[in-house]
Every structure is written in C-alpha cells, then in structure tokens.
Amino acid sequence: MKNLQKLLLLILPFFTACTKDNGNGNTPPAETMYFPPTTGTSWDTKTIASLGWNQSAIQPLKDYLLQKNSKSFMILVNGRIVMEEYFDGHTATTTWPWNSAGKTLTTATTGIAQQEGLLNINTSVSTYLGAGWTSAPANKENLVTSRHLLTMTSGLNDANNLVTPANLTYLADAGTRWSYHNVFQKLMDVVAAASGQDFEMYFNTKLKNKLGMDGFWNNGLIFKIYHSNTRSMARFGILALNKGKWESEQVVNENFFTESINTSQSINPAYGYLWWLNGKSSFMLPGGQTVYPGTLVPNAPPDMYAAMGAEDQRIY
C-alpha cells in the first residue's frame, strides 16, 4: 500500500456473532442487527474482549494506520462500533471526501428512483436527457442506458475526465467495453430529470436523511464528490450490509441492491453497479484495459463487496 497523504478507512465486516456450544446443548441466539438513532451521537459499542479477538494486535494496527497517514478508521460488527480511531487532527465531526467510494451513493439513489417508478435503468439515457448529451452518432448514443452508466460499459471515450458532450465520443457499442470513467455522473442528471428536482435534494430526502447521515455533494467542474464525517460513511455501510434496509424500512429495493453487489457484466466480473466485488476469477482496474487473473483482494473474504475511492477511502 502506498504511503498516502490522505487515507480514510472504514471497515464493516460482513460477519455475525459466532455461535458455540455452551456445554449444555443450547446454542446462543445470533446477535441482532443494530441501527444507530438517526439523531444525536449515541451509538452502541462492543469490546474487542467480548468478541474474543486478539487484543495484542490492536496497538500494532493503530501504529500501522498512523504510519499510513490515516485520518479515521472504524470497525463495526452488526452495526455496533468495535473500533473508532482518528488521527492527524481528524475528529468524529471532521468532514472528509469519499472520492469514488461515493459512487455507491449514486447507485442507491438511482435504485430508489427506479423503485418509485421515475426511471428504468434499462431505458436509453437519451429518453431522460434528450439527444446530444454525447458526441456519438445518434444511433450509438441511444444504445447507452443508465445500466451501462452503472456498470462502466457506456462505450464512450474515457480519455478525458471532464464530462461534456464534446468529450463523450464513441469508442464502442454500449455493453461491449468496460472502462472506469466519470460519465457515471450523468446518472445524477437522469435522476434529476426523472424526479423533477435537483439530485442532491432528492438524495437528501430519499437516502441521506433516512439514515441520519450528514454531508454534502461538492459538484466541481470535473468531479462530483460526497463529503461527510466518518460515522455517516458507517451509516451507509450498515445500509449496505443489510442489502438496502434500515431498521424496518427497505430504503433501497433489495433486488436492486443485490444486483448492485453482483457481477453486472462479463467483461469485468469484479464490478457491480459502481460497487467493487471480491472473489471473482479476474478483475480490471481504473485507467487501463488489462484483465488481471485472480481476486481483487486475495486476503479478504470472497463475498466481500466494497465502495472504493482514491486515497484509500473505503467501505468494506
């Protein structure tokens, strides 16, 4: 791992409390999932000792995080905080960019808009944005659906990060080429057009506020990046762990969320709907067309799915 100047780690392990025979033939009940209140700062915790983890490994972990210029690091088990560490002046209230890990927020918001009947991800983007949102020939532009934007398979030129019609030229038919690119941002325009309101307003109402998150979108000329404190990132991680459900409300349709965290196309099996997937036979990375054999993170669980952004902004 590179010695990055900015590093935010959030780990939400996808495991439940272990069950063991207690000697009398009875198996302890599995621990329930915990959802922190959407207001205030209270949040249930668990101790390292209660989980039976190796407590002597904690200080070396903290030393490693400090060495790597980490800003914050959290471990949650079933929604409860096990570790919450801040470094280099960073605090629980410090706002920090998610970078591309925030793409998964766009995925969730798009899924909500679909479940409300406002859009269909298999419909041409041009249906919502009109003709000319790219410089591709009309028949090629019309091939691009929101699903292609979710899966990085638009076939549009990825050479320039600035998403303008002039830069969105035709390279390949939609669905035939995987390439990591900022064109996913057009999903925000699709949601805005379909809902009749600003994307951030729709996002705040349908997702952010329901989870008790803080934060805002910084819509720069090139990048559209979400900023929040680490606990807000953790809240979204809990939603992701529960396949789009928060307490009793299915905020994001479960079928859509399940699609999001499974292979979305055959070109890069390690990619879902803007989510990265472990345990696949091969993977591709941003910035190239090389196909690498093996799993994305060999020492991680094969069923892990992750929101991943530059400078190691992560939800695992």
Question: What are the roles of these predicted feature ranges?
Answer:
Residues K2-L10:
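Sec-dependent signal peptide recognition
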Residues F15-T91, W96, Q114-L119, T151, ...:
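N-terminal leader/targeting segments and the immediately adjacent pre-domain N-terminus
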Residues T47-A49, A92-P97, T134-P137, L171-R177, ...:
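Second-shell loop/turn segments in exported
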Residues G79, W96-N122, L149, K186-V191, ...:
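Active-site SXXK
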Residues E116-S154, S195-N229:
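Active-site helix/loop module of the DD-peptidase/beta-lactamase fold
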Residues G212-R314:
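Penicillin-binding protein/beta-lactamase superfamily catalytic region
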